[in-house]
Amino acid sequence: AHPILFERLQRNPHCPEVIVVDPRATETAMAATLHLPVAPKSDQVLLYGIARALIARGAVDPAFVRDHTSGYDEFASFVDAFDMDLVSAATGVEVALIDRAADAIAAGERVSFWWTMGVNQGHAATRTAQAVIALALMTGSIGRPGTGANSITGQCNAMGSRLFSNTASMFAGRDATDPAQREAVAEILGIDVAAIPDRPSMAYDQIVDGIESGTIRGLWIIATNPAHSWIDQQRFNGLLDELDLLVVQDLYSDTETARRSDLFLPAAGWGEKDGTFINSERRVGRVRAASEPPGQARPEFETFKGLAEDWGCGPMFRRWRDRSRGHGRGWSCRVR
């Protein structure tokens, strides 16, 4: 699923140890030095058990924990209940294999933790991701080359959306509540800092709550079908009628959400629009349209720019081609 990253692993001259946690014997698992075939939905228990084992091995970085974390004592007390016998029974993984994984992490000078949609869109996703991050933090495996808690995106150009304003108001790595960071982004974009909100946009659950409370009266849904594919479908579907206006912008007009819309905006498909995407090497790839979009369909960004012109903020979009030049200013890993 992520050939660029895995090929980097294969080319590593230091022959790193690769531990794969997956119920399935995938190609990645078969190429790993250690495969932990956990039972579905048991990742969280495994991670807590490994955390307990690392504490027992003295593999915690006390200076890093002291200077850069909070709540470690509470976490250590919590995972103390996850002994190897309990973890093995819950995960179906032999104690010896779990011990091998803990030993490898404890002995590693540079340990990197990677996960993708199997965690982020799986059972107890938030807690499982937090458990992975906790392993990186408690061992000090973060902030140095070859380390890190790395959540790898799952869909094409999902990384692009994160780098360029996944919070709808700031570039990635910036804090919307920090005036200095808002000033920096405004300078890069060449716009008035007052145009940048001082708070992040709303998450899905907050949007649903906003519809229910009446705070949100109109909703514009782009390239997704929450009436079918998102969590708590029954609640969301029941709230759609509470909106004064539902706009759906999508390639398909017959999705469950599109059929409920007051206004449908037909979008161009991937082969019908120019654009770019960003891959795991931070390279920006150029995409050119193979054909014209049919009928009234148009690229999403053209719709956004048109609306911006009508709202009087069109000039803020006219320098969009130069955004990437300043996006990574001050970063050690610039987008190329």
Place the predicted regions along the sequence by residue.
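Cofactor-pocket helix-loop regions in the catalytic cores of large enzyme subunits
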Residues: 1-157, 163-164, 181-336
